[in-house]
Structure formats: C-alpha cells, structure tokens
Amino acid sequence: MSHDANTIDSRTHEGELNKLGFWIFLTAEFALFGTLFATLLTLQHGGGYGGKLTTDLFELHLILIMTFALLISSYTCGIAIYYMRQEKQNLMMFWMIITVILGLVFVGFEIYEFAHYASEGVNPTIGSFWSSFFILLGTHGAHVSLGIVWVICLLIQIGTRGLDSYNAPKLFIVSLYWHFLDVVWVFIFTAVYMIGMVYSG
C-alpha cells in the first residue's frame, strides 16, 4: 500500500508530526523488547528451569493458533488502512473490528497458556529462565491488550464523529503499533517457542 500525500491520514501537519513522534516512540519499544529478548536468550542456555522443561510444556497446536490469529490480524489491519485511505468508513471499521476480534483470540489463548503453565507448577519464581519468559510474554501480551483498547476507542470516536483528517492519522499510527507487535511475536515464536520445543537448558 503506497503512501500518498493526499490520503486522509496525511492532510494535516499535526498528523504528520504525530507519526514522526510515534516512530521515535517505537525505537524505545525496540530497545525494550531487544533487552528482554537478550535476557531470555542468555538464560535459555544455562538459566534455571526449576525442573520444568520447555520441551515438555510447550504445545505446538496452541502456539500455532496464537500465531495465526496475530498474523492474520496484521493482514486485516492492513486492509482496514487501505479502506481508510479510500475513505470508505464502513469497510474500514469492519476490518478493524475483525482485527480486534483476532487480537482478543490471541490474548484469550495467551491467558489460557499461562493458566496451563500455572497448573503444571510453572511460575516466574521457579527459575531464572521462566522469570524472563513470563516477563517477555507478559509484556507483549500487555501491549497487545493496550492495542485492542486503543483501536476500540478510535472506532468509537470514528463511529461518533466520522472518519476525518483528525482521527485518520491516529488510526494509521495504531496500525503501525499493531504491525510492530506482530513482528515481535514472530521473533518470540522463532526464538522462544521453536527453540524451546527442541532444547531446554
């Protein structure tokens, strides 16, 4: 989807400044998740597991459901932004609602995953690896939850006052945020789950 200076999200100077500010904010987010990843990867090789190994606990089908839900939501979010730039409000809202639903599916399964680990006696206190695991996954899950609330608030605003050059940049910014979280999840899926299914300690 090409960026056009005449699209509804690019018609105001304030909107463009907000986008620039958000890109700067994302650099801090990259630093945050980079630090969490570095910590977990270090502890993945030599950290304490408290006798609870990832090779025994990680469930591929559950992880795949979460992954597909989040990746498909990135696609539906992209479609929503396309329709936003076409100024087709109803179609934009439809695809953003689908995005929210998929996000809720992801969060729901992540809560289930954490509950499953808790039932197996796994918690952040049993070993350094699990502590870093729950911090990384919990931080990402909290960001996804925040993104869902953010989108819902914007959809309410747009539904009330209509799509305009004031709220369109906000919608574009939240789409960047959502895609960023999808990228983070791809790294989690690869570095945490895929490695964890074949190696512990």
Swiss-Prot record:
Molecular function as annotated in GO: cytochrome-c oxidase activity
Enzyme Commission identifier(s): 1.10.3.-
Protein topology in the membrane: Multi-pass membrane protein
EC category name: oxidoreductase
Any one Gene Ontology cellular component term annotated for this protein: plasma membrane
Record field: catalytic activity: 2 a quinol + O2 = 2 a quinone + 2 H2O
Biological process, per Gene Ontology: aerobic electron transport chain; ATP synthesis coupled electron transport
Stretches that traverse the bilayer: 20-40, 62-82, 91-111, 133-153, 172-192
Subcellular localization, as worded in the UniProt entry: Cell membrane
UniProt cross-references to SUPFAM superfamilies, sorted A to Z: Cytochrome c oxidase subunit III-like (SSF81452)
UniProt KW keywords: Cell membrane, Membrane, Oxidoreductase, Transmembrane, Transmembrane helix
Family: Belongs to the cytochrome c oxidase subunit 3 family.
Entry-linked NCBIfam families: QoxC
Task of the protein: Catalyzes quinol oxidation with the concomitant reduction of oxygen to water.
Protein name, UniProt field: Probable quinol oxidase subunit 3
Species of origin: Staphylococcus epidermidis (strain ATCC 35984 / DSM 28319 / BCRC 17069 / CCUG 31568 / BM 3577 / RP62A)
Phylogenetic placement of the source organism: Bacteria, Bacillati, Bacillota, Bacilli, Bacillales
